[in-house]
């Protein structure tokens, strides 16, 4: 007779992990899910094993809103090593080209405006983007180069921090879909010396505060203590994933209607557009709705708590 499968917990919220170097985002996700004994978990955009920093992990009903964090702005601190290009554009790859570094701080400062604003970027071959149903990195590992189209990205900030040749430290605030490895590789080519990522740390996702992150060691200590209550207290609310959306408070009657997936008409939505967060009269988060024509809202992602 097969042993009955142990049921996990219906736990809901967003956990902020300070991801350690050397672990994949998917490995981290499965370990966090196991530690929380959660029925459902999902991360909000992978970090390379080399990278450290903020990795929001959605548990339970929060997974319905993970796409909002995938689409959110990100901030990074990156150390680029000038003079070397690698096949992965980071320190984990093989060096494919070495050049002398005759780059001054002023030359770097003069180059940065070229990469700010709305630009086009060709994704790295070592990425999870798919071609004919297979991730690009699988082609890359087989020595196959696939033609990739340049994609629009936005670099909101690209700030110089320090330069001690051959190491250049920058801070980046960017849109979704930005590959920092590609940005560094492109910058190295623009400077004429080549470059790759030596260190990468994600410092922010959306508006999540860095002081709410837990280190891997702290998480393991909670797990060893079997203190689920303390772990649960570290979770941020489900609606934190959509905190940038405007709030729309509903009446009791409207709350019941959206609970059944029905559209609700308002007299005046005060020029609200796009998507809104819905709350009940008791200030309970209900989900996200789309604002349509004639002041009608349509429930799109509703929580089931």
UniProtKB/Swiss-Prot annotation:
Coiled coil: none annotated. One of its GO terms (biological process) is mRNA pseudouridine synthesis. InterPro entries: PsdUridine_synth_cat_dom_sf (IPR020103), PsdUridine_synth_N (IPR002501), PUA-like_sf (IPR015947), PUA_sf (IPR036974), tRNA_psdUridine_synth_TruB (IPR014780), tRNA_sdUridine_synth_fam1_C (IPR015240), TruB_C (IPR032819). Its EC number is 5.4.99.25. Gene3D superfamilies: Pseudouridine synthase, PUA domain. Disulfide bonds: none annotated. GO terms for molecular function: RNA binding; tRNA pseudouridine(55) synthase activity. Keywords: Isomerase, tRNA processing. It is an enzyme of class 5 (isomerase). CDD domains: PseudoU_synth_EcTruB, PUA_TruB_bacterial. Responsible for synthesis of pseudouridine from uracil-55 in the psi GC loop of transfer RNAs. Belongs to the pseudouridine synthase TruB family. Type 1 subfamily. This is tRNA pseudouridine synthase B. It comes from Mannheimia succiniciproducens (strain KCTC 0769BP / MBEL55E).
């Amino acid at each position: 007779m097969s042993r009955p499968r142990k049921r996990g917990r219906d736990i809901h919220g967003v956990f902020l992990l300070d991801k350690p170097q050397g672990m994949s985002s998917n490995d981290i996700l499965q370990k966090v899910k196991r530690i929380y004994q959660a029925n459902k978990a999902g991360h909000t955009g992978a970090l390379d094993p080399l990278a450290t920093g903020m990795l929001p992990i959605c548990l339970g009903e929060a997974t319905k809103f993970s796409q909002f964090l995938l689409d959110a702005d990100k901030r990074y601190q990156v150390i680029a090593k000038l003079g070397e290009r690698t096949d992965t554009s980071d320190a984990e790859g093989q060096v494919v080209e070495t050049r002398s570094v005759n780059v001054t701080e002023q030359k770097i400062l003069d180059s940065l405006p070229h990469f700010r604003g709305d630009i086009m970027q060709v994704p790295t071959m070592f990425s999870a983007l798919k071609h004919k149903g297979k991730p690009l990195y699988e082609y890359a590992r087989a020595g196959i180069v696939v033609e990739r189209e340049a994609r629009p990205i936005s670099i909101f900030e690209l700030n110089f921090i320090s330069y001690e040749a051959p190491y250049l430290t920058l801070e980046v605030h960017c849109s979704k879909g930005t590959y920092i490895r590609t940005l560094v590789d492109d910058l190295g080519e623009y400077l004429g010396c080549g470059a790759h990522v030596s260190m990468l740390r994600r410092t922010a996702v959306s508006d999540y505060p860095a002081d709410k992150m837990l280190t891997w060691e702290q998480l393991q200590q909670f797990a060893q203590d079997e203190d689920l209550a303390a772990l649960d207290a570290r979770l941020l609310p489900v609606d934190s994933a959509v905190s940038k959306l405007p709030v729309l408070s509903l009446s009791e009657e409207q709350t019941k209607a959206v609970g059944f997936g029905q559209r609700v008409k308002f007299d005046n939505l005060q020029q609200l557009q796009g998507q809104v967060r819905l709350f009940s009269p008791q200030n309970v988060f209900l989900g996200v709705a789309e604002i349509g024509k004639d002041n009608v809202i349509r429930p799109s992602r509703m929580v089931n708590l």
